[in-house]
């Protein structure tokens, strides 16, 4: 199964693509990274134009990698001037995934941390170490948004 993980944002959307294969008779399986990176939007453009950039680039990623499941980080904001724009960008991401008919699972940050490290209060380094271990990577995936998206993809596999 191919899973696309997404770490939503307006300036940078992290994405990570993994392939997973269940092992017979075991709950866990093997997984490997196919691709990861970011969708970067131009801060000099209007929010609407940036949403178009996000949708366009995500469509291309979906067409190239043909995922069977999308796993998206679900986040909660308290007070931030950027909240509305990020929520709108997340809506564009969800809509684009739905247009491709992809099943979508969503996880809050604590659940992602729990799935990868065994506790919901892990720091970024602990999550990164878990991503590297699970995907058998020698070097950390960069940038951080891409590494976060791989964590989201792995959570989709572990929890789906």
Curated annotation (Swiss-Prot):
Mg(2+) 1 binds at residues 7, 145. It catalyses: Endonucleolytic cleavage at a junction such as a reciprocal single-stranded crossover between two homologous DNA duplexes (Holliday junction). GO terms for biological process: DNA recombination; DNA repair. It is an enzyme of class 3 (hydrolase). Coiled coil: none annotated. The active site is at residues 7, 73, 145. Its cofactor is Mg(2+). PANTHER family: CROSSOVER JUNCTION ENDODEOXYRIBONUCLEASE RUVC. Homodimer which binds Holliday junction (HJ) DNA. The HJ becomes 2-fold symmetrical on binding to RuvC with unstacked arms; it has a different conformation from HJ DNA in complex with RuvA. In the full resolvosome a probable DNA-RuvA(4)-RuvB(12)-RuvC(2) complex forms which resolves the HJ. NCBIfam families: PRK00039.2-1 (NF000711). This is Crossover junction endodeoxyribonuclease RuvC. It comes from Synechococcus sp. (strain CC9311).
